[in-house]
Amino acid sequence: MRVVFKLPDELRQELKNPLGELIEGNIPEPYVKAKNIIEGDDGVLITVGDVVTENIMRVGLNPNLAIYDHKTERREYKPRIIINGVLLTVKNPPGTITLPLLKSIKKAYSLILNGKSVHIVVNGEEDLATIPAVLYAPLGATVIYGQPKRGIVLIKVTNECKRRCAKIMRRMEVVRDGD
């Protein structure tokens, strides 16, 4: 049976608010600021989004986990991303979090614990992947995702932000085959 977590309309507006620290500015400014914040940090670095992953790599940081979909703002995008690790691909329709996406993110963290870097290329849309990326991340990890027209959002993973993401997941509509 296929299970999908679907974003209900009432959560859509809420998720337009940053889940962490908003770093505003034009490229490359937010990425340079993010680098200064996290440089020297031994924690796991996760990027969500093509533009975010590309620009984090451009300022000299290599994410342990990069999740992207070859799109930006719903348009095709060919990021200049060097895949320097394990490549996983997964299907995930827009506005959803599928079980295969959840399993890929969990698998990625186990690979990271074994010293690997992981890229998850999503066929569909990765916009909601930040939620499970935070949920499954080790405490102290940094998750960075894009905030359209504003900049990037930097999340330091704590128990509190894990609880917030779990609460969001619980509020999503669970759809099973045949529903």
Swiss-Prot record:
It is an enzyme of class 2 (transferase). HAMAP family: Dephospho_CoA_kinase_GTP_dep. It catalyses: 3'-dephospho-CoA + GTP = GDP + CoA + H(+). This is GTP-dependent dephospho-CoA kinase. Keywords: Coenzyme A biosynthesis, GTP-binding, Kinase, Nucleotide-binding, Transferase. Belongs to the GTP-dependent DPCK family. GTP binds at residues 50-52, 69, 71, 126. InterPro entries: deph_CoA_kin_Thcocales, GTP-dep_dephospho-CoA_kin. PANTHER family: GTP-DEPENDENT DEPHOSPHO-COA KINASE, UPF0218 PROTEIN TK1697. Its EC number is 2.7.1.237. Catalyzes the GTP-dependent phosphorylation of the 3'-hydroxyl group of dephosphocoenzyme A to form coenzyme A (CoA). It holds the Pfam family DUF359. GO terms for biological process: coenzyme A biosynthetic process. Pathway: Cofactor biosynthesis; coenzyme A biosynthesis.
